[in-house]
Amino acid sequence: MRLNVGLIGKGKWGTILKSKLTEIANLKFVLGKNKNYFDFILANKLSWVFIATPNNTHFELVKNCLNLKVNVFCEKPLTINYLEAKKLIKIAKKNKVKLYVSDVYSFHNKKPKKILLKNRIIRSKKSNMNDNEFFYRFMYHDISILFNFLKKYNIKSVSFKKFIKKKIYKTNIQFKN
């Protein structure tokens, strides 16, 4: 039996998710982030809502779906704020629903591992994006890959700074030890 699912987000990742969801589920609707999705969710008795909208919209969308007692798959990052992420986890537990954050690149680490074993300095080039896009969409993958190799060192925080007319970013990873 195929599950009834809905998709909020019509951008690049929304389009990718749509093509996959139509193959494996009953995709009941695809909405932009500004549509009133409450009625669609309630009318279609959904098992899951997939969210692929801009990062700054994730918290409210996910929170509202969880409060409707619907399982949520959210494209990363879950939120742009740690405390908001903790709130969403608490809401999911309270409502006994599942909350999943896409993290597919964490499982493809053979090549990065070879690079890490050879090099002490790792450079990652990204261009044509604003600060939030850079950090939350692209650096996320770099940090996620690094985390797989550095987790035994207890990471305390990750931050970034922009330099040279906003074209170069420096990322700092601070360890507890």
Question: Which positions does each model-derived feature cover?
Answer:
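N-terminal Rossmann-like dinucleotide-binding module
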Residues: 1-34
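Histidine-centered divalent metal-coordination motifs
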Residues: 17, 58, 141
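Conserved acidic residues
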Residues: 28, 47, 120
